[in-house]
Design a protein with these regions (language model features):
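C-terminal binding/interaction regions
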Residues: 1-21, 26-27, 37, 50, ...
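Short, thiol/selenol-centered motifs that function as redox-active sites or metal-ligating centers
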Residues: 34, 56-65, 103
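A short interface-forming secondary-structure element
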Residues: 43, 47-48, 52-61
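Short beta-strand elements
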Residues: 31, 36-46
C-alpha cells in the first residue's frame, strides 16, 4: 500500500510513545478483525489533557493514528477530545486507503473510551 508522507512520518517518528507512571486513566482497544492494539495513557489537569501517551501493536496507519491523536488531543477538554473523528485523522493524513480506515476508527474508539474513563475518574475524585 502507498501511504502519504504524513502517515509515514508519524509511523517512522511517532510522537508521545510510552507509558505514564501516574495516569488519570488508561484504556486499551483491540480491533477484533485485524488484531491491532492501541493503548492510551492520559493525565488531566484543570479539565484538559495535560499529557497523552500511547503504545500500538499494529499496522503502519494504526501506529500513525495513535501518534497523531496524542498531538491532536493535547490541551483539549474532554468534550473536545471526544469530538475528534476518524474523518479528521484521515484528512490530516491526506486520506487513507479503504483497507486502512480501521486504523482511524480504532484511534477514535480508544479516544472515546478514554474520555469516558476520564469522566468517570473525575466523578470519583469529586465524591458523593
Amino acid at each position: 500500500m502507498i501511504y502519504s508522507e504524513k502517515v509515514l512520518e508519524h509511523f517512522h517518528h511517532p510522537r508521545n510513545v510510552g507509558e505514564i507512571e501516574r495516569p488519570s486513566a488508561v484504556v486499551e482497544m483491540t480491533n477484533p478483525v485485524c488484531g491491532d492494539v492501541l493503548k492510551l495513557w492520559a493525565v488531566v489537569e484543570d479539565g484538559r489533557i495535560a499529557e497523552l501517551k500511547f503504545k500500538c501493536e499494529g499496522c503502519i496507519p494504526a501506529v500513525a493514528a495513535g501518534s497523531w491523536v496524542t498531538e491532536a488531543a493535547h490541551g483539549k477538554s474532554l468534550d473536545e477530545l471526544m469530538a475528534i473523528t476518524a474523518r479528521q485523522i484521515e484528512a490530516a493524513f491526506g486520506g487513507l486507503p479503504p483497507a486502512s480506515h480501521h486504523a482511524s476508527e480504532l484511534a477514535v474508539a480508544a479516544l472515546k473510551r478514554l474520555g469516558q474513563a476520564l469522566r468517570h475518574s473525575q466523578r470519583d475524585d469529586v465524591g458523593p
